[in-house]
Amino acid sequence: MIFTSSIGAFKPSLEIGAYNISKLALLGLVRNVAAEFGPSGVRANAVCPGLVKTEFAKALYEDPKRAKIAEGMTALKRLGEPEDFRGVAVFLASKASEYMTGQAVTVCGGSNMWA
């Protein structure tokens, strides 16, 4: 199982607190599914994206000032694109990750290093 959480799970927010809390709760679900169903061969992991250019985040990246701040917070100095997550999802779905469960993989251009 591959769940989509967020780097928001790892830090508080005064603007989107309920969203971040829900993403942290999802990581709890991932770990519990991994523990409960692991003996049956079920693996559960989460992908935790940073700011990605999607419809959901449009208000952030379409505002040049906010986009520049967000880009500046990443080591790669750019915002994520939906395509940036394909490889991680393919890896988590493949045999290459067959001994991996209960984990949260961040894909955030390095922005979570500062959390």
Task: For the regions a language model picked out, list residue spans one by one.
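Residue(s) in the substrate-gating loop at a strand-loop-helix junction
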Residues: S6
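Short C-terminal tail/terminal secondary-structure segment
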Residues: K11, V90, T101-A115
